[in-house]
A protein has these predicted regions:
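Extracellular glycoside hydrolase catalytic/binding regions
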Residues: 1-135, 157
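Aromatic-rich peripheral "rim/lid" segments of glycoside hydrolase catalytic domains that contact
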Residues: 117-178
Length: 178
């Protein structure tokens, strides 16, 4: 990534760059590889990773994976009784990276399939949003709009946001449009 960052900074010195680790942007790879040791580039003005306020760390969080990616209906608490621990652990690790390197962190992908009872999806999204807010982690949900065949998409062209209004409110703080 260092060569890419140097090239971009030549023409766009203040462009926001979001950099994640390898292997699906797991937080453990953010904290291991998005560091001055691995991003050891030096720009023409002598600055580098540590000096760049417009370089953010990126990670994905899919805990519990059986719930977020599972194709069968699951009770998030019964089937994954310690699911919150994995979420909090990832958030804490990302936040520690942010504080150590004085950089913002962005959870660029999180979410779950909508084949579960909606109350479980609502509980999951409410918890995730609250945990990110505690640490000022920027985020985007995967995914709000896609197509009617995608099991993660919140919006359906035939019935809008019907059935997921509580999830949309958790994510946006507002009732979904009609």
């Amino acid at each position: 990534y260092g060569d890419c960052i140097q090239t971009i900074r030549t023409s766009n010195p203040t462009r926001l760059l979001a950099v994640g680790g390898p292997h699906y942007n797991g937080v453990e790879f953010l904290t291991k590889y998005v560091t001055p040791e691995y991003l050891s580039y030096t720009l023409k003005d002598g600055t580098g990773f540590a000096d760049d306020p417009n370089l953010w760390g990126v990670f994905h969080c899919y805990h519990p994976r059986g719930f977020t990616h599972g194709a069968i209906d699951q009770d998030i608490n019964k089937d994954h009784p310690h699911w919150r621990d994995g979420v909090v652990s990832d958030m804490e690790e990302a936040n520690a990276w942010s504080e150590k390197h004085h950089k913002r962190v962005y959870l660029s992908e999180w979410g779950c399939r909508l084949n579960h009872e909606i109350r479980h999806v609502e509980e999951y999204t409410a918890f995730m949003v609250a945990e990110m807010a505690k640490r000022a982690i920027e985020w985007s949900y995967y995914c709000g709009l896609f197509n009617n065949a995608w099991p993660y998409g919140l919006y359906n062209s035939e019935w809008g946001f019907e059935g997921v209004k509580g999830v949309v409110k958790n994510l946006t703080g507002q009732e979904p449009p009609k």
